[in-house]
Amino acid sequence: MNAAALEAEDPSRAGQSPLRWWILAGVWLIYMCFGLTASSLAPLVAPIIRDLGLTHTEMGSVLGAWQLAFIVSAIPCGMLVDRLRPRRALLVGAFLIALSGVARSFATDYFTLFLAAALFGVGGPIVSTGAPKVVSQWFTGNERGLAMGIYISGPFAGGVVTLVTTNAVMMPLFEQNWRAVLLAWAGLAALSGLIWLVVSSRPEARQKEANLASATKVPTTTEIATLLRLRPVQILLVMAVCIFMINHGFSNWLPEILRSGRMDAVTAGYYAAFPTIVAVIGSIVIPRYAVPARRVMMLALLATSAGAGTLLLFIDTGPLLVLGLFLQGVSRGAMMTLAMLLLIELPAVGDKRVGTASGLFFAFAEVGGVGGPLTLGLLYDLTHSFTAGLLMLAGFAAIILVCLWALRPYLKAPPTASLEHR
């Protein structure tokens, strides 16, 4: 069945179904709980280190544990999404995220906390690879960029909730019991799965998924190898590592970086939430204007913003610190979105390989997701300062600029002329 036949049989494929916005809202809610759970440990670093007797290096490895599991599971989960279909897959992902939150709340030492955090790395990639597949199914043309920006704002919104409310609201509410706070976040994740079940069970959604499943082929390991041989895919995967190195290193340690400048925990939480709020807005607004002809230029500006924002964190207080946090928020909110758009719109990817291509993207990206938090923690233990870690993150922003320079010829060339690795 070709695309034209699908549109004739399924009007929502042409972007005409009102249900697509409810579907997008359901995806956003799950992805918001993804971000909420991913960032839930960062504001609780101090009490967790104290109660469980951890070093900063051990805590850094815990913060990177789920990304480590993500690396191993992202590609299989991407293939699972293509095989199982995203409606069911996202439900499974939501409940695995909730289970990780519950397990964290019962951790008794470094090992159990590490395993609980790593469990998130099994549910997380199902959501990360399933979400772009849902968007590619329900949205086309200019709406696709908007929809991508909206759903990717979800994790940042979840980060805002945890950073703003953990020490200011939740910890006092639960009598400074960090375990109860983590359990509450797990309950929200489970609720998001139930809401998705209701929204995605509509007959129209079931029919659309059945139509698309009959028209697409389940990817194989051979197709993964084919994607990995494409030069633009290789470049984008290197960029993914750098983007996540910056995003995860920055977001996981930002409250502690600010506290090292003599801020109290509540004030640091408010300051740390500021770039996340900016990221929510940026992830929605910027992709709307990132038409294909502008994407490389806009990504270059965002990488420059990330590097400059990181360097400005050397200033403890004042307007320049706020500017640095703002620049970090702008870049964090949109870099991944634009890189994902470049990847899934490559001719060699197409709708049938979105899940697998997304799995590849996140499998490589989470190398940076692990390396960022772990390396910052290690460098702090070695130097008793975050200076070396911040300089490292600025260096990865520079690498993104080099990758964009290398990517440009392949985006300008005809699809069949220069995609293959030569």
Short names for language-model regions:
Residues 39, 67-75, 159-160, 276-284, ...:
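Residue-level signature of mid-helix packing/kink "hotspots" within the transmembrane helices
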Residues 293-342:
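C-terminal transmembrane helical hairpin of 12-TM major facilitator-type secondary transporters
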Residues 116-154:
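Cytoplasmic helix-loop-helix junction between adjacent transmembrane helices
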Residues 150-201:
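Helix-loop-helix hairpin linking two adjacent transmembrane segments in secondary transporters
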Residues 198-222, 414-420:
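Flexible cytoplasmic inter-helical loops of multi-pass small-molecule transporters
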Residues 350-385:
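A late C-terminal transmembrane helix in Major Facilitator Superfamily
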Residues 41-42, 231-283:
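Extracytoplasmic gate region of multi-pass secondary transporters
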Residues 72-110:
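Conserved MFS/SLC helix-loop-helix module at the cytosolic interface between two early adjacent transmembrane helices
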